[in-house]
């Protein structure tokens, strides 16, 4: 017979961003707890609101499965003394298992007998295991925790209630400073305390108290209500997924409504209005059928439709205050002079160990000069790049960005266009922040892409130079994200810029403000990001490509993909083994690898030398790999008919030189001796 288990923890208001991860974590840890305790179940459903985390297990076994375990002990010769009595070693072994020497049997393994005991454990009733759910709750981890009421323990928020029910059976358990009961709390304003009758009545018992415990149901309620408003007013409402997830974790009983604001605020840039609504007020944006922003918004109330008009007025009043700020800054910022703001950046600290933002911009500008040539920018693009690099951080000192920091770069674009700068300069100022996340949008323009790379490279090199290098998961200055951005942009634009050569060029630059240091660490850091971009590529293939001599990001990613693509083909293993053997022997070559045809002693030497001399890797990675694999028969014939490590030193070095020249060319693709063919 199966049972149903409910565990609910009632807390003070949780931060919206921790609700969903905590709910998921609770479900995963409950499943692990049940598995560890040999309790089978049909399904686990999790619940969450801003004031509760809960999990319900249905189809739960009414008892643990029985356990039979065999334990291997010492060898028989150690377990028995000369008189055939059990030694202390044998006695200690069985005692540790809760058994006696009478339980010992001997089993033969590979010609030798060993002590074995079998331990049988009868499964306990589920009621005996349920109290362990308290440990599951204690094991939950959170990004932040707090103390309260002078207690020594800490948790994400103060705990108010604990409910643990096995069907209708209530468990009186203690958790932190709370004693368990079947009492749960309803909606803070509309509901009251209520008793959960059974594990299966949980949602309905709370629904009567204006709490929708299932987040999926709350989400659907919000979406349906928004769609209803759309249909009623003939508008389009942007249901942003992240905003929706945040809003549903701010309410226990959602009611969506539409408010409005004065159309005069539409003269302010749309980005300012959208930021005010979405980021600051958690409102959904409303547009007409053509996508034009309307002077309306959608908000979601934590409650029902009672006195909704008052709620709408309150939300409108709060939003207008934000929009007034935006309108004021938009008007006042246009009076500022860009060159004056750039000069003031001399007094803004980039980092206390690195210097000012202006110094950061100057270094970035010098990097853009190198990159412009390597990226093949036109004369006009180079001019636009130079101008953008000279001013691109100015908007950090505007009133708008000071109030709405999410708009940095965006407002820079707006203000530069108003000041008469070219669209390319303006776009680059916006795009230099991209990407803002691991999978974020990339720059579209070449000028913006180069400025983004240059800005990120100086950031990375500057922090590394003063010893602020990420370690473990600690990366307070987001240098991994910056490096990932550099790698992604280079790959997206297909620029054949060798990162090792570029970094060498950067370290050769001279600045008054800073000297770049720790080049080796920077190179390893960049390679680690390329490694990450290779995703699920097998580790040995990643290592082979990363160990190669070609550090053009696009080429490396293409090479890894090509190797994975052919790794299941018949000729992959023998071809890689041939090249790998060449790589291993080539390491023994001394000095400059020059080949003297006069020292050839067989046709196979000559054939390989000629094949290497004419080898020019070209085309896509798949084609280059075919070129290399085509050498496999020639390499094999060479090894079958040639003693590479000949006694004659000149002959030996000549043969190693052939292999050295081969591997030098092949290494532009990958170091094949890093690939595992076993």
UniProtKB/Swiss-Prot annotation:
GO molecular-function term, one example from the UniProt record: glycine-tRNA ligase activity
Biological process terms in GO annotation: arginyl-tRNA aminoacylation; glycyl-tRNA aminoacylation
Cross-referenced PROSITE patterns: AA_TRNA_LIGASE_II_GLYAB (PS50861)
Record's GO cellular component terms: cytosol
Reactions that this protein is recorded to catalyse: tRNA(Gly) + glycine + ATP = glycyl-tRNA(Gly) + AMP + diphosphate
SUPFAM superfamilies in UniProt: HD-domain/PDEase-like
Family membership: Belongs to the class-II aminoacyl-tRNA synthetase family.
EC number, as in UniProt: 6.1.1.14
Protein name as it appears in the record: Glycine--tRNA ligase beta subunit
InterPro entries, sorted: DALR_anticod-bd, Gly-tRNA-synth_bsu, Gly-tRNA-synth_heterodimer
Assembly and oligomerization: Tetramer of two alpha and two beta subunits.
Enzyme's top EC category: ligase
Intracellular or extracellular location(s): Cytoplasm
PANTHER family in UniProt: GLYCINE--TRNA LIGASE, CHLOROPLASTIC_MITOCHONDRIAL 2, GLYCYL-TRNA SYNTHETASE
Keyword list, A-Z: Aminoacyl-tRNA synthetase, ATP-binding, Cytoplasm, Ligase, Nucleotide-binding, Protein biosynthesis
């Amino acid at each position: 017979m199966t049972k149903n288990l409910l565990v609910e923890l009632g807390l003070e208001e949780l931060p919206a961003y921790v609700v969903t991860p905590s709910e998921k974590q609770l479900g995963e840890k409950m499943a692990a707890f049940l598995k560890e305790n040999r309790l089978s179940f049909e399904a686990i459903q999790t619940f969450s609101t801003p004031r509760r985390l809960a999990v319900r297990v249905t189809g739960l076994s009414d008892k643990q499965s029985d356990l039979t375990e065999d334990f291997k002990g010492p060898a028989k010769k150690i377990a028995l003394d000369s008189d055939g009595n059990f030694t202390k070693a044998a006695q200690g072994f069985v005692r540790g298992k809760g058994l006696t020497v009478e339980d010992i049997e001997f089993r033969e393994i590979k010609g030798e007998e060993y002590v074995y005991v079998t331990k049988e454990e009868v499964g306990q009733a589920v009621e005996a295991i349920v109290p362990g759910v308290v440990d599951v709750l204690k094991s939950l981890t959170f990004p932040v925790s707090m103390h309260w009421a002078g207690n020594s323990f800490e948790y994400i928020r103060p705990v108010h209630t604990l409910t643990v029910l096995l069907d209708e059976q209530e468990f009186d358990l203690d958790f932190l400073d709370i004693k368990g009961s079947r009492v749960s709390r309803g909606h803070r304003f509309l509901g009251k305390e209520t008793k959960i009758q059974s594990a299966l009545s949980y949602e309905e018992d709370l629904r009567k108290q204006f709490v929708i415990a299932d987040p999926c149901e709350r989400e659907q309620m919000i979406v349906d209500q928004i769609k209803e408003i759309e249909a009623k007013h003939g508008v389009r409402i942007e249901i942003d997924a992240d905003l929706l997830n945040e809003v549903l974790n701010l309410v226990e009983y959602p009611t969506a409504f539409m408010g409005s604001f004065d159309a005069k605020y539409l003269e302010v840039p749309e980005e300012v209005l959208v930021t005010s609504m979405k980021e600051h007020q958690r409102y959904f944006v409303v547009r007409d059928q053509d996508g034009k922003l309307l002077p309306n918004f959608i908000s979601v109330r934590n409650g029902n439709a009672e006195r909704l008009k008052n709620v709408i007025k309150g939300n409108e009043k709060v939003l207008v205050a934000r929009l007034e700020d935006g309108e004021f800054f938009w008007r006042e910022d246009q009076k500022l002079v860009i060159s004056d703001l750039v000069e003031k950046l001399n007094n803004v600290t980039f980092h206390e160990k690195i210097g000012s933002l202006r110094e950061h911009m100057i270094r970035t500008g010098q990097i853009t000069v190198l990159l412009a040539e390597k990226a093949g920018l036109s004369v006009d693009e180079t001019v636009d790049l130079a101008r953008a690099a000279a001013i691109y951080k100015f908007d950090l000192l505007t009133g708008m960005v000071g109030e709405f920091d999410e708009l940095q770069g965006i407002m820079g674009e707006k203000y530069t266009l108003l000041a008469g700068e070219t669209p390319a300069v303006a776009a680059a100022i916006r795009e230099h922040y991209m990407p803002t996340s691991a999978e974020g949008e990339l720059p579209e323009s070449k000028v913006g892409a180069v400025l983004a790379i240059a800005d990120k490279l100086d950031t990375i090199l500057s922090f590394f130079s003063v010893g602020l290098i990420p370690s473990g998961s600690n990366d307070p200055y987001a240098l991994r994200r910056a490096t990932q951005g550099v790698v992604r942009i280079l790959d997206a634009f297909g620029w054949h810029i060798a990162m090792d050569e570029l970094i060498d060029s950067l370290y050769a630059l001279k600045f008054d403000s800073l000297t770049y240091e720790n080049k080796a660490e920077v190179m390893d850091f960049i390679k680690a990001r390329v490694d990450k971009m290779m995703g699920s590529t097998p580790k040995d293939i990643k290592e082979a490509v990363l160990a190669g001599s070609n550090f053009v990001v696009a080429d490396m990613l293409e090479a890894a993909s090509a190797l994975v693509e052919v790794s299941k083909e018949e000729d992959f293993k023998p071809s890689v083994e041939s090249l790998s053997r060449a790589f291993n022997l080539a390491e023994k070559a001394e000095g400059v690898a020059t080949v003297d045809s006069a020292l050839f002693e067989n046709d196979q030497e000559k054939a390989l030398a000629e094949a290497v001399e004419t080898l020019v890797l070209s085309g896509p990675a798949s084609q280059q790999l075919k070129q290399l694999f085509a050498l496999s028969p020639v390499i094999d014939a060479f090894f079958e008919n040639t003693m590479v490590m000949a006694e004659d030193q000149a002959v030996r070095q000549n043969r190693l030189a052939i292999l050295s020249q081969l591997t030098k060319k092949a290494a532009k693709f990958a170091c094949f001796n890093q690939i595992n063919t076993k």
